[in-house]
Amino acid sequence: MLWQTFFSSLLLLSLLFGCNGDESLPEVTDSEEAPMDKREREALYSAIQGFVGDSWNGSALYPDPCGWTPIQGVSCDIYNDLWYVTDLSLGLIYENSLPCSSSLQIRPELFELKHLRSLSFFNCFISPMVIAKEELWTNFASNLESLEFRSNPGLIGELPETIGNLTKLKSLVVLENGFSGELPASICNLKRLKRLVFAGNSFAGMIPNCFKGLKELLILDLSRNSFSGTLPTSFGDLVSLLKLDLSNNLLEGNLPQELGFLKNLTLLDLRNNRFSGGLSKNIENIQSLTELVLSNNPMGEEDMVGTNWGKMSNLVVLDLSKMGLRGEIPTSLTNLKRLRFLGLNNNNLTGFVPSKKLEALPCLGALYINGNNLTGELRFSTKFYEKMGRRFKASKNPNLCQPLEMVMSESHKHLSPLGVKPCT
């Protein structure tokens, strides 16, 4: 009993004074010890209420938004022993996110969140409205690193020139909204950008030729707009770029030689534009490419043999359909051992199909050569047809045929390519 009392006393002393004789235990930091800045909390409530509706009572529902009553879409961090909002996402991004009201307001209190690093709006702006006053956005210039507007058809008008004042931005995503007009050249002031997306809007006019300083940019997506004119030569200075998507615009002219300087590029998608003048010889120098999509551009009577496709050994997707290409299918294509998709359809290709060499490509899972002037006999094996299924098309080649036994065989005729006549 005496020993039990002795050890209990030792335990009590260790709790009171610590192992090293300290007179107090370490402090625990929580929302009680680090309260939220009062003005910050009120600004947050008012800003969210403007988007959600006046019936939303933030102080009653979420009395401690950075602590024990967190708001979905709100993240906080501590500055000078006080909690401040650092991330704010509005709209039904997640199942339990706060939905935006059809009569929302962008209140000035939003721009009082001075430590905000990330701000995103998803499916919030449905009714037509112009983005908030230009001068308010400069309040975010010191800290904002990510700004996203996704699926907001009611966001109309031009992108404000003051967007270029947000020089800390690393990610600017303006995806599937109602913006129109020309891109402000001030976006090229955003030297820290790694991702720049303006896809799915109604932007028009020429792309500003001012990208020289964006050395850190990894992703540039301007697809699904109405941009016109030629490609800026300053694209060649985007030395870190991994993905360039300019598809579905009204761009025209020759492909600039400067594209060949993009040595880290993995995706180049220029489909559905008006480019002409043939394939740029420098494209074959982008040996990092895994996806090259140039389909539906009137490139003219370009001979495919003039390009050494074998140099682009990392290609997985190659789509050159509807380009007016002529000549034979180059044998250098058969060196692309990683190729899974090859689209050569609806061109003016002639000559024989290198069946055995194409079949030898180990990863090939889709081959489209329909709509050309190819001749001779298809010499693919039944195993190839079984593998490809309907992902192989060779129809609309008037002088192309398939072996008679392929058509006559009851066990194989279901594999024979549609629209290819039997050889006689």
Swiss-Prot record:
Signal sequence range: 1-21
Membrane-spanning segments: none
Mapped LRR repeat ranges: 141-166, 167-190, 191-213, 214-237, 238-263, 265-286, 287-311, 312-336, 337-360, 362-387
Note: Loss-of-function mutants do not show any induction of At5g16590, another leucine-rich repeat protein located in plasma membrane microdomains.
Keywords: Cell membrane, Leucine-rich repeat, Membrane, Repeat, Signal
Designated name of the protein: Piriformospora indica-insensitive protein 2
One of the Pfam families matching this protein, by short name: LRR_8
Biological role: Required for growth promotion and enhanced seed production mediated by the endophytic fungus Piriformospora indica.
Disulfide bonds: none
Biological-process GO terms, alphabetical: biological process involved in symbiotic interaction; response to symbiotic fungus
SUPFAM superfamilies: L domain-like
KW Signal (keyword) present: yes
InterPro entries, per database record: Leu-rich_rpt, LRR_dom_sf, StomDev_PlantInt_Reg
Membrane topology: Peripheral membrane protein
Places the protein is found: Cell membrane
